Amino acid sequence: MSMTELSGVRTFLLGLQERVTAAVAEVDGGDFITDAWQKEPGEPLQGNGITKILENGEVFERAGCGFSHVQGSRLPPSATQHRPELAGAPFEAMGVSLVFHPRNPYVPTVHMNVRMLAATPVSAGPAEAVCWFGGGMDLTPYYGFDEDAVHFHQTCKDALAPFGGDKYPRFKQWCDEYFYLKHRQEQRGIGGIFFDDFQELGLEQSFAMMQSVADSFLPAYLPIVRRRQSQPYGARERDFQLYRRGRYVEFNLVWDRGTHFGLQSGGRTESILMSMPPLASWSYQHRAEAGSPEERLYKEFLIRRDWV
Protein backbone atom coordinates (compact mmCIF):
# COMPACT_ATOMS: atom_id res chain seq x y z
CA MET A 1 0.00 0.00 0.00
CA SER A 2 1.44 3.36 -1.05
CA MET A 3 1.72 6.45 1.13
CA THR A 4 -0.97 8.08 -1.02
CA GLU A 5 -3.35 5.18 -0.40
CA LEU A 6 -2.61 5.23 3.34
CA SER A 7 -3.29 8.96 3.38
CA GLY A 8 -6.63 8.39 1.65
CA VAL A 9 -7.71 5.87 4.28
CA ARG A 10 -6.66 8.21 7.09
CA THR A 11 -8.51 11.17 5.56
CA PHE A 12 -11.70 9.12 5.24
CA LEU A 13 -11.52 7.86 8.82
CA LEU A 14 -10.95 11.31 10.29
CA GLY A 15 -13.89 12.66 8.29
CA LEU A 16 -16.05 9.77 9.48
CA GLN A 17 -15.26 10.56 13.11
CA GLU A 18 -16.20 14.20 12.59
CA ARG A 19 -19.48 13.40 10.82
CA VAL A 20 -20.63 10.83 13.36
CA THR A 21 -19.82 12.87 16.45
CA ALA A 22 -21.44 16.00 14.98
CA ALA A 23 -24.66 14.10 14.25
CA VAL A 24 -24.75 12.48 17.69
CA ALA A 25 -24.04 15.79 19.44
CA GLU A 26 -26.99 17.31 17.58
CA VAL A 27 -29.30 14.53 18.79
CA ASP A 28 -28.03 14.68 22.37
CA GLY A 29 -27.55 18.41 22.79
CA GLY A 30 -24.23 17.86 24.54
CA ASP A 31 -20.66 18.34 23.38
CA PHE A 32 -17.91 15.83 22.73
CA ILE A 33 -14.60 16.40 24.48
CA THR A 34 -11.70 16.05 22.04
CA ASP A 35 -8.54 14.39 23.35
CA ALA A 36 -5.74 14.30 20.77
CA TRP A 37 -2.86 12.04 21.76
CA GLN A 38 0.60 11.09 20.56
CA LYS A 39 2.60 8.04 21.63
CA GLU A 40 5.88 8.87 23.36
CA PRO A 41 9.24 7.87 21.81
CA GLY A 42 10.40 4.49 23.03
CA GLU A 43 6.91 3.06 23.62
CA PRO A 44 6.03 -0.30 21.99
CA LEU A 45 3.62 1.47 19.65
CA GLN A 46 4.22 4.71 17.81
CA GLY A 47 1.51 6.87 16.33
CA ASN A 48 -1.32 9.18 17.23
CA GLY A 49 -5.05 9.46 17.50
CA ILE A 50 -8.07 11.44 18.55
CA THR A 51 -10.54 10.28 21.17
CA LYS A 52 -13.89 12.06 21.25
CA ILE A 53 -16.19 11.36 24.16
CA LEU A 54 -19.51 12.67 25.42
CA GLU A 55 -20.51 11.80 28.99
CA ASN A 56 -23.63 12.49 31.07
CA GLY A 57 -25.63 13.72 28.10
CA GLU A 58 -29.39 13.95 27.79
CA VAL A 59 -29.61 10.95 25.45
CA PHE A 60 -26.26 9.22 25.96
CA GLU A 61 -24.63 8.43 29.29
CA ARG A 62 -21.44 7.77 27.40
CA ALA A 63 -20.70 8.04 23.70
CA GLY A 64 -17.12 7.39 22.67
CA CYS A 65 -15.67 7.59 19.16
CA GLY A 66 -11.96 7.10 18.68
CA PHE A 67 -9.56 7.37 15.75
CA SER A 68 -6.11 5.82 15.98
CA HIS A 69 -3.17 5.42 13.59
CA VAL A 70 -0.32 3.38 15.01
CA GLN A 71 2.82 1.54 13.93
CA GLY A 72 4.46 -1.35 15.73
CA SER A 73 7.46 -3.62 15.32
CA ARG A 74 5.68 -6.92 16.03
CA LEU A 75 2.09 -7.96 15.37
CA PRO A 76 0.52 -9.21 18.63
CA PRO A 77 -0.96 -12.74 18.83
CA SER A 78 -4.56 -11.47 18.60
CA ALA A 79 -3.89 -10.22 15.05
CA THR A 80 -2.19 -13.34 13.71
CA GLN A 81 -4.61 -16.09 14.72
CA HIS A 82 -5.55 -16.63 11.06
CA ARG A 83 -2.23 -15.47 9.55
CA PRO A 84 0.59 -17.37 11.26
CA GLU A 85 3.02 -16.31 8.51
CA LEU A 86 2.77 -12.74 9.85
CA ALA A 87 3.70 -13.59 13.43
CA GLY A 88 6.15 -10.98 14.68
CA ALA A 89 5.86 -8.83 11.55
CA PRO A 90 6.07 -5.02 11.67
CA PHE A 91 2.67 -3.44 11.08
CA GLU A 92 0.64 -0.28 10.66
CA ALA A 93 -3.00 0.00 11.71
CA MET A 94 -5.64 2.69 11.64
CA GLY A 95 -9.33 2.77 12.34
CA VAL A 96 -12.37 4.36 13.91
CA SER A 97 -14.19 2.59 16.72
CA LEU A 98 -17.26 3.74 18.58
CA VAL A 99 -19.61 2.56 21.30
CA PHE A 100 -22.65 4.56 22.39
CA HIS A 101 -24.37 3.76 25.70
CA PRO A 102 -27.79 5.46 25.87
CA ARG A 103 -29.50 6.66 29.02
CA ASN A 104 -33.00 5.37 28.18
CA PRO A 105 -33.20 1.54 28.45
CA TYR A 106 -35.45 1.46 25.38
CA VAL A 107 -32.64 2.83 23.22
CA PRO A 108 -30.15 0.10 22.29
CA THR A 109 -26.40 0.29 22.74
CA VAL A 110 -24.49 0.30 19.46
CA HIS A 111 -20.96 -0.54 18.38
CA MET A 112 -19.29 0.22 15.06
CA ASN A 113 -15.72 -0.22 13.92
CA VAL A 114 -13.87 0.12 10.62
CA ARG A 115 -10.16 -0.46 10.30
CA MET A 116 -7.21 -1.18 8.04
CA LEU A 117 -4.09 -3.14 8.90
CA ALA A 118 -0.93 -3.51 6.83
CA ALA A 119 1.89 -5.88 7.79
CA THR A 120 5.17 -6.82 6.16
CA PRO A 121 6.28 -10.45 6.54
CA VAL A 122 9.68 -10.65 8.21
CA SER A 123 11.23 -12.26 5.11
CA ALA A 124 9.76 -9.71 2.67
CA GLY A 125 10.48 -6.14 1.64
CA PRO A 126 8.21 -3.10 2.14
CA ALA A 127 6.70 -3.53 -1.33
CA GLU A 128 5.32 -6.92 -0.27
CA ALA A 129 3.21 -5.62 2.62
CA VAL A 130 -0.06 -7.46 3.18
CA CYS A 131 -3.05 -5.17 3.67
CA TRP A 132 -6.56 -5.98 4.80
CA PHE A 133 -9.71 -4.32 6.09
CA GLY A 134 -12.16 -5.11 8.84
CA GLY A 135 -15.23 -3.66 10.40
CA GLY A 136 -18.93 -3.90 11.02
CA MET A 137 -21.62 -2.79 13.40
CA ASP A 138 -23.90 -4.51 15.89
CA LEU A 139 -26.88 -3.55 18.02
CA THR A 140 -27.46 -4.51 21.67
CA PRO A 141 -31.03 -3.79 22.79
CA TYR A 142 -32.26 -4.06 26.36
CA TYR A 143 -35.88 -4.22 25.23
CA GLY A 144 -36.60 -5.73 21.85
CA PHE A 145 -38.58 -4.16 19.00
CA ASP A 146 -38.91 -6.03 15.73
CA GLU A 147 -39.09 -2.88 13.62
CA ASP A 148 -35.79 -1.64 15.06
CA ALA A 149 -34.02 -4.93 14.37
CA VAL A 150 -35.38 -5.12 10.82
CA HIS A 151 -34.37 -1.52 10.09
CA PHE A 152 -30.84 -2.02 11.41
CA HIS A 153 -30.25 -5.22 9.45
CA GLN A 154 -31.84 -3.91 6.26
CA THR A 155 -29.56 -0.87 6.32
CA CYS A 156 -26.54 -3.15 6.76
CA LYS A 157 -27.70 -5.35 3.91
CA ASP A 158 -28.22 -2.37 1.60
CA ALA A 159 -24.72 -1.06 2.35
CA LEU A 160 -23.17 -4.36 1.25
CA ALA A 161 -25.40 -5.05 -1.76
CA PRO A 162 -23.15 -3.30 -4.35
CA PHE A 163 -20.29 -5.61 -3.40
CA GLY A 164 -22.07 -8.93 -3.95
CA GLY A 165 -25.18 -10.67 -2.71
CA ASP A 166 -23.10 -13.06 -0.62
CA LYS A 167 -21.63 -10.37 1.63
CA TYR A 168 -24.57 -9.65 3.95
CA PRO A 169 -25.40 -13.30 4.80
CA ARG A 170 -21.70 -14.09 5.28
CA PHE A 171 -21.00 -11.07 7.45
CA LYS A 172 -24.26 -11.44 9.36
CA GLN A 173 -23.35 -15.02 10.28
CA TRP A 174 -19.82 -13.92 11.16
CA CYS A 175 -21.27 -11.25 13.46
CA ASP A 176 -23.58 -13.74 15.18
CA GLU A 177 -20.65 -16.08 15.77
CA TYR A 178 -18.27 -13.34 16.92
CA PHE A 179 -20.51 -11.47 19.37
CA TYR A 180 -21.31 -14.55 21.40
CA LEU A 181 -20.51 -14.95 25.10
CA LYS A 182 -19.31 -18.54 25.23
CA HIS A 183 -19.15 -18.62 29.01
CA ARG A 184 -22.81 -17.49 29.19
CA GLN A 185 -24.01 -19.26 26.05
CA GLU A 186 -25.70 -16.01 25.02
CA GLN A 187 -25.65 -13.68 22.06
CA ARG A 188 -24.51 -10.18 23.02
CA GLY A 189 -27.35 -8.58 21.06
CA ILE A 190 -29.20 -8.90 17.76
CA GLY A 191 -25.98 -8.80 15.76
CA GLY A 192 -25.48 -6.92 12.54
CA ILE A 193 -22.46 -7.42 10.30
CA PHE A 194 -18.80 -8.21 10.99
CA PHE A 195 -15.84 -8.84 8.70
CA ASP A 196 -12.10 -9.10 9.24
CA ASP A 197 -8.93 -9.95 7.28
CA PHE A 198 -10.82 -8.81 4.17
CA GLN A 199 -9.00 -8.23 0.88
CA GLU A 200 -10.79 -10.48 -1.58
CA LEU A 201 -12.14 -7.61 -3.73
CA GLY A 202 -8.70 -6.07 -4.17
CA LEU A 203 -7.43 -3.01 -2.36
CA GLU A 204 -9.64 -0.37 -4.00
CA GLN A 205 -12.96 -2.23 -3.79
CA SER A 206 -12.28 -3.64 -0.33
CA PHE A 207 -11.70 -0.07 0.88
CA ALA A 208 -14.88 1.03 -0.92
CA MET A 209 -16.85 -1.67 0.89
CA MET A 210 -15.46 -0.55 4.23
CA GLN A 211 -16.48 3.03 3.39
CA SER A 212 -20.01 1.94 2.50
CA VAL A 213 -20.39 0.15 5.82
CA ALA A 214 -19.11 3.19 7.70
CA ASP A 215 -21.39 5.58 5.82
CA SER A 216 -24.44 3.44 6.63
CA PHE A 217 -23.96 3.71 10.39
CA LEU A 218 -25.90 6.93 11.04
CA PRO A 219 -28.88 5.88 8.86
CA ALA A 220 -28.90 2.50 10.63
CA TYR A 221 -28.85 3.81 14.19
CA LEU A 222 -30.17 7.35 14.57
CA PRO A 223 -33.76 6.62 13.44
CA ILE A 224 -33.95 4.03 16.24
CA VAL A 225 -32.62 6.53 18.78
CA ARG A 226 -35.18 9.15 17.76
CA ARG A 227 -37.98 6.59 17.93
CA ARG A 228 -37.15 5.41 21.48
CA GLN A 229 -35.35 8.22 23.32
CA SER A 230 -38.48 9.73 24.90
CA GLN A 231 -40.18 6.46 25.84
CA PRO A 232 -41.07 6.50 29.58
CA TYR A 233 -39.24 4.05 31.84
CA GLY A 234 -38.82 3.33 35.55
CA ALA A 235 -36.52 1.65 38.05
CA ARG A 236 -37.29 -1.84 36.74
CA GLU A 237 -36.17 -1.01 33.20
CA ARG A 238 -33.11 0.84 34.46
CA ASP A 239 -32.05 -2.06 36.69
CA PHE A 240 -32.36 -4.49 33.79
CA GLN A 241 -30.37 -2.19 31.53
CA LEU A 242 -27.52 -2.08 34.06
CA TYR A 243 -27.64 -5.86 34.47
CA ARG A 244 -27.42 -6.41 30.72
CA ARG A 245 -24.60 -3.89 30.46
CA GLY A 246 -22.63 -6.31 32.62
CA ARG A 247 -22.69 -8.74 29.70
CA TYR A 248 -21.22 -6.00 27.50
CA VAL A 249 -18.33 -5.60 29.93
CA GLU A 250 -17.77 -9.35 30.06
CA PHE A 251 -17.61 -9.68 26.28
CA ASN A 252 -15.27 -6.76 25.75
CA LEU A 253 -12.78 -7.86 28.39
CA VAL A 254 -12.93 -11.63 27.86
CA TRP A 255 -13.56 -12.19 24.15
CA ASP A 256 -13.11 -9.07 22.04
CA ARG A 257 -10.12 -9.28 19.67
CA GLY A 258 -9.96 -5.51 19.29
CA THR A 259 -9.60 -4.97 23.02
CA HIS A 260 -6.99 -7.72 23.24
CA PHE A 261 -5.09 -6.30 20.24
CA GLY A 262 -4.96 -2.86 21.80
CA LEU A 263 -3.83 -4.06 25.21
CA GLN A 264 -1.34 -6.65 23.90
CA SER A 265 0.29 -4.19 21.50
CA GLY A 266 0.76 -1.44 24.07
CA GLY A 267 -2.12 0.71 22.90
CA ARG A 268 -3.61 3.64 24.79
CA THR A 269 -5.60 2.03 27.59
CA GLU A 270 -7.89 4.99 28.28
CA SER A 271 -9.01 5.05 24.64
CA ILE A 272 -9.31 1.27 24.38
CA LEU A 273 -11.59 1.09 27.42
CA MET A 274 -13.84 4.00 26.43
CA SER A 275 -16.20 1.27 25.19
CA MET A 276 -17.05 0.35 28.78
CA PRO A 277 -20.46 1.53 30.05
CA PRO A 278 -20.29 4.18 32.79
CA LEU A 279 -22.44 2.01 35.07
CA ALA A 280 -23.16 -1.73 35.09
CA SER A 281 -24.33 -4.31 37.61
CA TRP A 282 -24.26 -8.03 38.29
CA SER A 283 -26.96 -10.05 40.03
CA TYR A 284 -26.46 -13.63 41.14
CA GLN A 285 -28.55 -16.09 39.09
CA HIS A 286 -30.84 -13.41 37.71
CA ARG A 287 -34.03 -14.81 36.16
CA ALA A 288 -36.41 -12.81 34.00
CA GLU A 289 -40.06 -13.04 35.03
CA ALA A 290 -42.14 -15.37 32.85
CA GLY A 291 -44.06 -13.48 30.19
CA SER A 292 -42.19 -10.23 30.84
CA PRO A 293 -40.55 -7.95 28.25
CA GLU A 294 -37.24 -8.95 29.79
CA GLU A 295 -37.92 -12.62 29.10
CA ARG A 296 -38.97 -11.72 25.56
CA LEU A 297 -35.53 -10.20 24.98
CA TYR A 298 -33.91 -13.56 25.72
CA LYS A 299 -36.40 -15.69 23.81
CA GLU A 300 -36.93 -13.58 20.70
CA PHE A 301 -33.93 -11.27 20.32
CA LEU A 302 -30.82 -12.77 21.91
CA ILE A 303 -30.93 -15.61 19.41
CA ARG A 304 -29.53 -16.10 15.93
CA ARG A 305 -32.37 -14.99 13.72
CA ASP A 306 -32.84 -13.84 10.12
CA TRP A 307 -34.23 -10.31 10.37
CA VAL A 308 -34.39 -9.52 6.64
Swiss-Prot record:
It holds the Pfam family Coprogen_oxidas. Substrate binds at S97, N113, V114, R115, G266, G267, R268. Homodimer. A divalent metal cation binds at H101, H111, H153, H183. Disulfide bonds: none annotated. Keywords: Cytoplasm, Heme biosynthesis, Metal-binding, Oxidoreductase, Porphyrin biosynthesis. GO terms for biological process: protoporphyrinogen IX biosynthetic process. The gene is hemF. PANTHER family: COPROPORPHYRINOGEN III OXIDASE, MITOCHONDRIAL (PTHR10755), OXYGEN-DEPENDENT COPROPORPHYRINOGEN-III OXIDASE, MITOCHONDRIAL (PTHR10755:SF0). Its main location: cytoplasm. Belongs to the aerobic coproporphyrinogen-III oxidase family. This is Oxygen-dependent coproporphyrinogen-III oxidase. It comes from Polaromonas sp. (strain JS666 / ATCC BAA-500).
